[in-house]
Amino acid sequence: MQLQLICEDPSQQSHLDELAARWQLSHTDDSDFALVLTTERLELRKVDEPKLGAIFVDLIGGAVGHRRKFGGGKGQAIAKAAGLNKGATPTVLDGTAGLGRDAFVLASLGCKVQMVERHPVVAALLDDGLARAKHDPEIGTWVSERMSLIHASSHDALEQLAQDKDFLQPDVVYLDPMYPHPENKKKSALVKKEMRVFQSLVGADLDADGLLAPAMALASKRVVVKRPDYADWLDEQKPSMAIETKKNRFDVYVKASMA
């Protein structure tokens, strides 16, 4: 993929070059997007809309850190959907990792989470945030033990992993495909910013319906699909149950009990 690659600290240029090679990114001055390596982190900027600010992964502080400390623990809807309220600590594969927030919540509650992210820029941002979190004195130990990243197309990855006899099947496959959101729906300023940037960079997951079948084949216990409250069921398949919040819905497709 081509976009602007900018290094703010000349001494870090070789690191940016390594990132570009790893994620198969190349520089062009013509892109509206810039992947910027600052002295602190990797971030994405929309050059033609500087007021949007930068997008980066922060698993230590901010909203994610606040949710880890005060977010309701295993009583959260996502935790219930994944089966944590039944006394289990399932292994999870997040097939649409994005910026890693939901995966981090599940990991903070004890789950081992493997994350799949198919877009190279998003994967690069997530990998950078994950690396910083692993070095944090407060959360670094368990982040290192419980969170890992796979960069691959979700469809291909789920299908290939399901056929891989050496791959330990996760108890839960979690999916949160990007969904085109109506302009009249209220979102937080942060989510609006990220959705605008991501939908122009990545686009909506128009092939998301194709994720459910390989996810069902891969998960040993259940598949959890996060949807906006106004969205249809994924692939028009009725879930076993749904857990609803104010703005979202977790559709749960049960294959086996969590016991």
Swiss-Prot record:
Phosphoprotein in keyword set: no
Subcellular location: Cytoplasm
SUPFAM superfamilies reported for this sequence: S-adenosyl-L-methionine-dependent methyltransferases
Catalytic activity: guanosine(1516) in 16S rRNA + S-adenosyl-L-methionine = N(2)-methylguanosine(1516) in 16S rRNA + S-adenosyl-L-homocysteine + H(+)
Top-rank lineage group of the source organism: Bacteria
The protein's Enzyme Commission number: 2.1.1.242
Database matches in InterPro entries: 16SrRNA_methylTrfase_J (IPR007536), SAM-dependent_MTases_sf (IPR029063)
UniProt keywords, alphabetically: Cytoplasm, Methyltransferase, rRNA processing, S-adenosyl-L-methionine, Transferase
Uppermost EC category: transferase
Annotated GO CC locations: cytoplasm
Annotated binding of S-adenosyl-L-methionine, by residue: 101-102, 117-118, 153-154, 176
Record GO terms (molecular function): rRNA (guanine-N2-)-methyltransferase activity
Role of this protein: Specifically methylates the guanosine in position 1516 of 16S rRNA.
Family in the record: Belongs to the methyltransferase superfamily. RsmJ family.
Stated name of the protein: Ribosomal RNA small subunit methyltransferase J
Species of the source: Vibrio campbellii (strain ATCC BAA-1116)
Source organism phylogeny: Bacteria, Pseudomonadati, Pseudomonadota, Gammaproteobacteria, Vibrionales
